[in-house]
Amino acid sequence: MIKRNLPLMITIGVFVLGYLYCLTQFPGFASTRVICNILTDNAFLGIIAVGMTFVILSGGIDLSVGSVIAFTGVFLAKVIGDFGLSPLLAFPLVLVMGCAFGAFMGLLIDALKIPAFIITLAGMFFLRGVSYLVSEESIPINHPIYDTLSSLAWKIPGGGRLSAMGLLMLAVVVIGIFLAHRTRFGNQVYVIGGNATSANLMGISTRSTTIRIYMLSTGLATLAGIVFSIYTQAGYALAGVGVELDAIASVVIGGTLLSGGVGTVLGTLFGVAIQGLIQTYINFDGTLSSWWTKIAIGILLFIFIALQRGLTVLWENRQSSPVTRVNIAQR
């Protein structure tokens, strides 16, 4: 129980302490406007990170998600701008394509027994290359539906405006929590991440589960690509470069073990929030380079990976400790 909950508790503690520090330096952090801006600015990252959580929980990795964002953007820009397709038709079309691509990668990973790192790396290069073939330049997306979605928001007390993008990200997190803890699929993901051999012995179809895991990951990455295209009002082949690393960082900082089997979607939300908090603090400060965000995230990653290793060793030692037999003399 401690092994499963301690990383999440530490992540929440880091976020609370970080927010309180930001509040002492800049009282404006108490405004709901700032909180809503953090949600909007990191909506696409939060959506991707939920999918990445399931991948890492299973003991895998998905390096293709950044390229999925790029492909989604240029595909939408092309079919909406050049072919006149309505976004209401283009969105489900590209979502189906994204899910199919993830299912194909999941099938290759299980059938060929090739590490997910290699398969998804190939997927990353493939989709990035296809994105460049579509267009090397940024393609603006001019459509009334895009204008409506980008400005859609609800006023909340304190002057904040909760955007549709931020609300969608929170909805994805809630659905992710439900999938992870209240469905057979979620249980299978945890079992496979804990011990794939045991999962097979228990009769769990690792192939079916692996396919669904990567389908979910790329499906959410495609959804994030739609959100990103609405946020930027454009499609660009260079979009999403390095986002896969930001997503992995959010998941790890959120308390999910890289070895798989332990972690929560809620922790990932706080991992994304910590990154957003650091970026916002740097923007408020005005004197620090934006690269300090990467430095701070790097330091946090070192700390959390060390924590993960310590917890894993402690758990293994407790599991392998000898059992002392007590002989009771019978009279």
What are the residue ranges of the model-derived segments?
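Transmembrane alpha-helical segments in multi-pass inner-membrane proteins
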Residues: A221, Y231-G298
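Transmembrane helix-bundle core of multi-pass membrane transporters
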Residues: K3, L112, A116-R182, T209-I211, ...
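Hydrophobic alpha-helical segments embedded in the membrane of multi-pass proteins
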Residues: N42-G51, S67, F71, A100-A103, ...
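Structural signal for alpha-helical transmembrane segments and their membrane-water exit/capping regions
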Residues: V14-A30, S58, S131-S135, I177-R184, ...
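Helix-loop-helix "hairpin" substructures at the membrane interface of multi-pass membrane proteins
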Residues: S86-V94, A100-M105, I109, P157-G235
